[in-house]
């Protein structure tokens, strides 16, 4: 058979690496990819809901952090005003 006929030509499909960019062992589908939609969950699981007490504690901590950051910003603004006022 001539060399250009599919399936003939000695060492097989030598152009597969250039066509896919993957070596032979990575082209197989038996490692990472799933073929059936029922293999996947319908949606990602939700994180557990916070209790109201935990949410309140988290929000108060965020408020304190933001207030501290606002104070730092106010101090820096005053420093810049003093430097520019000279």
Swiss-Prot record:
Q: Which residues form a coiled coil?
A: 49-85
Database matches in InterPro entries: DUF5320 (IPR035205)
Which UniProt keywords are listed?
A: Coiled coil
Task: Specify the superkingdom.
Answer: Archaea
Query: Per UniProt, what is one Pfam family of this protein?
Result: DUF5320
The name on file for this protein is Uncharacterized protein AF_2392
Q: Which organism is it from?
A: Archaeoglobus fulgidus (strain ATCC 49558 / DSM 4304 / JCM 9628 / NBRC 100126 / VC-16)
């Amino acid at each position: 058979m001539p060399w250009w006929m599919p399936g003939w030509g000695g060492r097989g499909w030598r152009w597969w690496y250039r066509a896919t960019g993957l070596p032979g062992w990575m082209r197989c589908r038996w490692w990472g990819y799933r073929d059936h939609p029922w293999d996947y969950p319908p949606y990602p699981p939700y994180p557990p809901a916070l209790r109201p007490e935990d949410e309140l504690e988290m929000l108060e901590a965020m408020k304190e952090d933001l207030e501290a950051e606002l104070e730092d910003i106010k101090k820096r603004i005053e420093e810049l005003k003093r430097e520019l006022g000279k």
